Amino acid sequence: MPIYLDHNATTPLAPEVLEAMLPYLQGPYANASSLHRLGRASRDAIEAARAEVADLLGAQASQVIWTSGGTEANNLAIKGVMHQGGRLLYGATEHPAVMECAESLMAVPRTVVESIPVTAGGLIALDRLHAQLAQAPVTLVSVMAANNETGVIQDVAAIGRAVHEIPDALFHVDAVQAAGKLPVDVRQMGADLLTVSSHKLYGPKGVGALLRTAPVDLWPLHHGGAQ
């Protein structure tokens, strides 16, 4: 029998998670936006899950936005903030979900996209970050908390403090690789936006979340029903 050890790439579904999900996979079924009894029960289950995610990450339930995974959450954070242009800084060793999203914005009018250099050890070069922050107004800084391939763990709190010295600058943390392995507290990190993904911490695939702690309007990636 194969032994799976690559838990930095993905994790198996925990038995207790499967047990909690089965009642909703097997029915009865109801749209959580419906006002009848079954609809309200579905809504209650979603809100209970939202509260658990918030508690895990030191946030409030109202700050949790459900997504289809880490990639959508990262795109919503970055494109949602940058849709009208501005200046975006991102770490030079980010996950492709951030790096390619950032690079796609180079075609957007009035948008400047710059990478933040890292040291030989893979850490964000704080002196270079301070210099970049001082050059011109910054709209958003995006940095991953931990790198699943190199094992580098960023000093996210120090980066957050540097970002918040700049008026109106927002700080996005990609915590997909950290949540479930390291303590993640959105307040201690100073993150205005924070991304997590369920399949990295023994949950189902196809589920992620974006935490929004700052009072910022995010331009939606999709348009449709409120649910």
Language-model-derived ranges and their functions:
Residues 1-227:
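Pyridoxal 5′-phosphate
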